[in-house]
UniProtKB/Swiss-Prot annotation:
Molecular-function GO terms, alphabetical: exodeoxyribonuclease VII activity
Coiled-coil segments on the chain, per record: none
Organism: Leifsonia xyli subsp. xyli (strain CTCB07)
This protein's name: Exodeoxyribonuclease 7 small subunit
Positions of region (Disordered): 71-92
Lineage: Bacteria, Bacillati, Actinomycetota, Actinomycetes, Micrococcales
Biased composition (Low complexity): 71-84
Entry EC number(s): 3.1.11.6
Class in the EC hierarchy, top level: hydrolase
Signal peptide region: none
NCBIfam families: PRK00977.1-3 (NF002139), xseB (TIGR01280)
Gene Ontology CC, one term: cytosol
Chain's gene name: xseB
Function: Bidirectionally degrades single-stranded DNA into large acid-insoluble oligonucleotides, which are then degraded further into small acid-soluble oligonucleotides.
Cellular localization per UniProt: Cytoplasm
Length: 92
């Protein structure tokens, strides 16, 4: 397996890291690697799994922020409509 250095894993996107992790797991499951190769694959797999987790945590944070922003916008819009309704009732 031609793998990039562990330090380069941080440059991988989620799908790239996930796909490589699948390849690493498959290679480990085949059991044809030497002990040294297996340890290197294991370490790479751990680093790839961490990278995937970082992406998922980041994606969740972005979704949470978007939901909070949407809820805030909806709350602001409701407040504005309520204020307009009160203003119209006061002037009648």
């Amino acid at each position: 397996m031609d793998a990039m250095p562990l330090s380069d894993i941080s440059a991988l996107g989620y799908e790239e890291a996930r796909d490589e992790l699948v390849r690493v797991v498959t290679e480990l499951e085949q059991g044809s690697a030497t002990l040294e190769e297996s340890l290197a694959l294991w370490e790479r797999g751990e680093a790839l799994a961490r990278r995937c987790e970082e992406w998922l945590i980041g994606a969740k944070a972005r979704l949470d922020a978007a939901r909070a922003g949407a809820a805030e916008s909806a709350g602001t819009a409701k407040s504005a409509v309520a204020a307009d309704s009160r203003g119209a009732a006061d002037s009648a």
